[in-house]
Amino acid sequence: MERRVRVKSWVEENRASFQPPVCNKLMHQEQLKIMFVGGPNTRKDYHIEEGEEVFYQLEGDMILRVLEQGQHRDVPIRQGEIFLLPARVPHSPQRFANTMGLVIERRRLESELDGLRYYVGDTEDVLFEKWFHCKDLGTQLAPIIQEFFHSEQYRTGKPNPDQLLKELPFPLNTRSIMKPMSLKAWLDGHSRELQAGTSLSLFGDSYETQVIAHGQGSSKGPRQDVDVWLWQQEGSSKVTMGGQCIALAPDDSLLVPAGTSYVWERAQGSVALSVTQDPARKKPWW
């Protein structure tokens, strides 16, 4: 039986899990990975993956350090802001005490690799790297980080060319990174269209991630190969699936598993988000 989860209540119930050194906990770990991350957590490593990541700050601000078009830069994501990180962008989340963020990513395809890299200062020169098939980022990162801290590269600050890949599994992304935006301001600015029954994409159609805002109306599935995560923002809605009817109030969320038939009916005044990440929408990078 699928159950609704009230996001802020779930965060409070699991508050102890967000303290160092762990700092994160998964709400869902299916095709979609719905996780919440606290702080403080200052990192030097950069993560690279073939999928995209959604960031949303529930409490406080964070910094997402990225390597964009050959330049290191900081992307501030403030409380209430949402941000989509494109695939294949090296990124290093910097989180602070008394903050809480939502991160959404997807299960990796068997053919996909993740990378963990350390750079020489603020250059593009790679000091240390490991590439791996990611099944559980929470358990797989720590041993790699410890390996780096015990390495000759860490001690000397100089790379070992014999331990670096001659050719990457995929090219790094060269597209410009969008600015984070206030989710509430975006929804308020499109309220007339949403209440007229028009569903709107926050990030457009050029990504595998689809974050869709819905007003009153109805929609149905299934999505055969991907999960759908629903998050009620305002008003009410109800989801009928598997013989049960699940009512959603503000801040309630629900994961609809891949392949599940459902009908989602949204009342007048309802504003809600649906999130999917479909690797079939990946853009060729060659």
From Swiss-Prot:
Keywords: Cytoplasm, Dioxygenase, Iron, Metal-binding, Oxidoreductase, Pyridine nucleotide biosynthesis. GO terms for molecular function: 3-hydroxyanthranilate 3,4-dioxygenase activity; ferrous iron binding. It is found in: Cytoplasm, Cytosol. It holds the Pfam family 3-HAO. Its cofactor is Fe(2+). Residues 178-286 are annotated as: Domain B. Disruption phenotype: No visible phenotype. Mice were born at the expected Mendelian ratio and are normal. They however show very high levels of 3-hydroxyanthranilate compared to wild-type mice. It catalyses: 3-hydroxyanthranilate + O2 = (2Z,4Z)-2-amino-3-carboxymuconate 6-semialdehyde. Belongs to the 3-HAO family. Catalyzes the oxidative ring opening of 3-hydroxyanthranilate to 2-amino-3-carboxymuconate semialdehyde, which spontaneously cyclizes to quinolinate. This is 3-hydroxyanthranilate 3,4-dioxygenase.
